[in-house]
Regions:
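Sec/Tat signal peptide C-region and signal peptidase I cleavage site
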Residues: 22-27
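Bacterial N-terminal signal peptides
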Residues: 10-20
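Exported/periplasmic ABC-transporter solute-binding proteins
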Residues: 28-177
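Bacterial N-terminal signal peptides that target proteins for export
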Residues: 2-11
Length: 177
């Protein structure tokens, strides 16, 4: 009888341990830090602005104008300050392709060099090294606009809709894919 209890106890321990060992290390589900209207899909980019900015929605054409410095003031007459991720970041590549209509970072750099030389643009976008830096910049600069992966948004900034769609909505176009 003692032997049966010992085998049963050992078997139970093996089952319990193997269940936790076989579970992936990243099995904990990551929950967005800021509640959005929809559940963002992995790879959705969120356009973020300073919390005081009253803008709720921008069209893709308006976003393009802001990111290319063709518009440099919000409707409140607040000066805009565009933030971009560093060259080579997948988020930056997606913004260049989907918002700016450019396939290479070099096209973006050339665009701003020409615009600055012809005095059409005074302020170039601010390049930031990480999503944390992007959020911090946008949270601290009242006219700032930037972007991060939707699952990285925190309550210090506000997500705006693009073409009346939020990250996670069906048909949302700003994705890394």
């Amino acid at each position: 009888m003692f032997r049966a209890k010992q085998i049963f106890s050992t078997l139970l321990i093996v089952i319990l341990v193997s269940g936790s060992v076989l579970a992936p290390a990243n099995a904990v589900e990551r929950v967005p830090r800021l509640p959005l209207l929809s559940t963002p899909q992995r790879g959705d980019l969120a356009i973020i602005v300073h919390k005081s900015n009253p803008v709720q929605n921008l069209t893709m054409a308006e976003l393009r104008q802001y990111f290319l410095a063709e518009r440099n003031h919000w409707s409140t007459q607040q000066k805009t300050r565009v933030a971009m991720r560093e060259p080579g970041a997948p988020e930056r590549d997606a913004v260049l392709r989907l918002i700016c209509g450019m396939n290479r970072d070099q096209d973006f750099t050339t665009y701003f060099l020409r615009a600055k030389f012809s005095e059409q643009v005074i302020d170039e976008p601010r390049n930031l090294d990480s999503s944390a830096d992007m959020i911090k910049f946008v949270a601290n600069v009242s006219g700032a606009i930037g972007y991060v992966r939707a699952d990285e948004v925190d309550p210090s900034v506000r997500v705006i809709k693009v073409d009346n769609l939020a990250p996670g909505d069906p048909g949302y176009k700003l994705t890394l894919h």
